[in-house]
Amino acid sequence: MPAPAALRVRGSSSPRVALALGSGGARGYAHIGVIQALRERGYDIVGIAGSSMGAVVGGVHAAGRLDEFAHWAKSLTQRTILRLLDPSISAAGILRAEKILDAVRDIVGPVAIEQLPIPYTAVATDLLAGKSVWFQRGPLDAAIRASIAIPGVIAPHEVDGRLLADGGILDPLPMAPIAGVNADLTIAVSLNGSEAGPARDAEPNVTAEWLNRMVRSTSALFDVSAARSLLDRPTARAVLSRFGAAAAESDSWSQAPEIEQRPAGPPADREEAADTPGLPKMGSFEVMNRTIDIAQSALARHTLAGYPADLLIEVPRSTCRSLEFHRAVEVIAVGRALATQALEAFEIDDDESAAATIEG
């Protein structure tokens, strides 16, 4: 029978860690802080599995380029993110994400997963077969591209005749791929933890600017009516909601005007919400985002029931919205603080458990 994690960690000068990094968009920057805290405390990461943003951070760390990636992420502003957006007229998604992948390729280089110094698994979802797909061989960038294809937002990625999308659809916290790793400690990092405080206020000016820039950037590719069709899609509105605003609408697009900012949802919905004291006002896209978070939290709990982690670190959903990729500095700090707190508590428990075992 394997020794408890407490004894395995206590008996090692550099405890071996298997790490499961969950999906959750920009909250995935917290994974960087978690890994930094582990390294500072002398833990040796010997296996990584990741879904979506967890696949990105896990992949760059397995390639030995986490510090470079963190530096790049911290340099991102709202304007640079706008330049990285890669609009698509495909019905499968409003973004292609190729510019973002180019930036990741520049950091990690042309490396194959089987050549990485740390065993690594990226998890994606086969949309046609309805199954999870594990990438443990092949180009790292292709595995990451498949794992980050948010449904309806980033177009799916075709690999060997399979249409692949975000790993978080079926496996938002991939514990199974690291179950066989020879480690002293298994750590799961979930990005769908309970709220730590009130949700942040919307940033309407940011979203209005995003829409105006999107219209101008896409006008060279297709006509204004096509741009209107693209940005009027529910998935496009969901992107705007996740970017940090309630919603943005325009009455007239014929001359690509500046965007008029309005509250989310039709008037009837707003009146109904206003008539119900004590309930938060949620537009249709906030409802959709919340639905996704609830589903992923339930899937993660189901996974942990079958593959328990020795230590679970939960990043609150309120840390940031899924597409607020300009907030790397503060989200990394949140991850580092949560990991430090969790590891300190675990190490204290380890000391007490070990003492009790010896005395018993």
Curated annotation (Swiss-Prot):
Location of the active site: 52, 166
Motif range (GXSXG): 50-54
List the Gene Ontology MF annotations in alphabetical order.
Answer: lysophospholipase activity
Superkingdom of origin organism: Bacteria
Spans annotated as Disordered? 251-282
Q: Where is this motif: DGA/G?
A: 166-168
Which segments constitute the PNPLA domain?
19-179
GO biological process entries: lipid catabolic process; phosphatidylcholine metabolic process
> CDD domains in the record, alphabetically?
Pat_NTE_like_bacteria
Supply the alphabetized keyword list: Hydrolase, Lipid degradation, Lipid metabolism
SUPFAM superfamilies documented for this protein: FabD/lysophospholipase-like (SSF52151)
- Give the matching PANTHER family: NEUROPATHY TARGET ESTERASE/SWISS CHEESE D.MELANOGASTER, NTE FAMILY PROTEIN RSSA
Q: Which family does it belong to?
A: Belongs to the NTE family.
Please state what the protein is called. Answer: Uncharacterized NTE family protein Mb1092c
Which species is listed as the source?
Mycobacterium bovis (strain ATCC BAA-935 / AF2122/97)
The beginning of the lineage is: Bacteria, Bacillati, Actinomycetota, Actinomycetes, Mycobacteriales
